[in-house]
Design a protein with these regions (language model features):
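Phosphoinositide-binding peripheral membrane targeting modules
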Residues: 34-72
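A near-ubiquitous, low-amplitude feature marking generic local secondary-structure context
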Residues: 16-17, 21, 39, 87, ...
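Anionic N-terminal interaction surfaces
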Residues: 1-35
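His/acidic/aromatic-lined binding-pocket segments of jelly-roll/cupin-type domains
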Residues: 30-31, 49-50, 82
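Acidic, Ser/Thr- and proline-rich intrinsically disordered linker/docking segments
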Residues: 2-3, 58-119
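Short, surface-exposed coil-to-beta transition loops
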Residues: 28, 46, 77-79
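A generic alpha-helix propensity feature with a strong bias for hydrophobic helices
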Residues: 17-18, 55, 118
Length: 119
């Protein structure tokens, strides 16, 4: 069953472009990279929002560290985020596994001319 994605930017894709692009996008956890858009996980649902690749100005990875836990705070975990900049906005999306985020960033480098990494 196809559920159309919600456009997060001012630019929108027509339904005849959006549907096949979303159906055949490459999946990275709750995210997807198609030929025309980057699909983002929203509200616990996979690929429910999208940003056209023409609207994205920059993407990069942000890493964080959890508050210490187990044995008086001596063990820490890393948190990884995909940060997307578009239309003058910037939003971070959480990834569970860093290797999936690295694979998505590598695919963006290869398939598009969007700058990857901080300026």
């Amino acid at each position: 069953m196809y559920i159309p994605s919600k456009a997060l930017s001012e630019k929108k894709l027509p339904p005849e472009v959006l549907r096949p692009d979303k159906m055949f996008c490459i999946h990275y956890e709750d995210f997807g990279l198609g030929d025309a858009a980057l699909y983002l996980g929203m509200y616990g649902l996979s690929r429910m929002g999208y940003i056209p690749l023409s609207a994205i100005t920059r993407v990069f990875k942000r890493l964080g560290v959890t508050k210490g836990f187990f044995e008086n705070g001596k063990i820490y975990g890393t948190l990884c985020y995909l940060v997307v900049c578009w239309d003058g906005k910037q939003k971070a999306y959480r990834f569970t596994h860093e290797e999936n985020l690295d694979a998505l960033l590598q695919a963006i480098r290869e398939k598009t001319n969007i700058p990857v990494g901080k300026p």
